[in-house]
Amino acid sequence: MGADTAFPKREAVEDNYLMSPAYTALYERVLDYCRESVAASTGQGNQQRVRYWAAIAILRCVLSSPAAAGAVLTNRLEGFDLGPGADDDADPDAAYSPQVMELTSEELATDFAPSAPIEDAAATMASPEQKRLMALLRDASKLAGPKNDAKLAKTLELVRSLLKDTYRPIVFCRFIATANYVAEQLQKELGKSVRVVAVTGEHSDEERRERIADLVEHEQRVLVATDCLSEGVNLQQHFDAVVHYDLPWNPNRSWPSS
């Protein structure tokens, strides 16, 4: 309309990274496991759909971060043999999609690692298959740090560049475990001159406000957050760049058909 506005010009940039050899090898092992797990389902009741959602959840966690894979293992998989399995009368798609995929409903969305479908699928597995899955997730959790985690290394590079250009970035992550991992790694690599804080769904509204209030006292600052901050908190006053660590994805693209 020819009139100046108070809104800054939005610049969107996509960047790429290549997984390290160690992460690539792990991902290929996980992909093979997921394919075999779904194919091995007996098809009784909802078992195959449960395993399908478990496979997507495993892939999401491994691709998000080593910490997200480790969180599933720590929170749920140690209790494998105690689970009764998924309810045959329940709808797996309705039960698991709020955890695994991006949703528009704030009441359904969660930033916790999607361990429920993995736990329910594990209850249908024989012991060797359970042990194989646990070993994969343990191996994934060992790849933490920029040496083996190229996604983290690329993010560190981007954040350093933004800070050098006097930006104050937010790094958005899908899962709590990933956000805490990224914040810890960024703080370690960036040093004491930069303040890095994670704010996630594990914090109350008051705790979120307090953590952000403390953070904005620092000239060089990085906020790492999940979508818990998508509503109710005005971030534009104190931050002026965004990095999306976990992009929405289609499982059919990440998991090509054989």
Regions found by a protein language model. Give the residues of each.
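Inter-lobe coupling linker of SF2 helicases/translocases
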Residues: 1-92
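Short glycine-/polar-rich loops that comprise or flank the Walker A/P-loop
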Residues: 10-12, 166-167, 191-195, 218-220, ...
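Conserved interdomain hinge at the start of the Helicase C-terminal
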Residues: 26, 35-47, 146-174
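Glycine-rich phosphate-binding "P-loop"
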Residues: 131-153, 199
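Conserved helicase motor "Helicase C" RecA-like lobe of SF1/SF2 P-loop NTPases
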Residues: 174-198
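Conserved RecA-like helicase motor core of SF1/SF2 enzymes
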Residues: 202, 221, 227-258
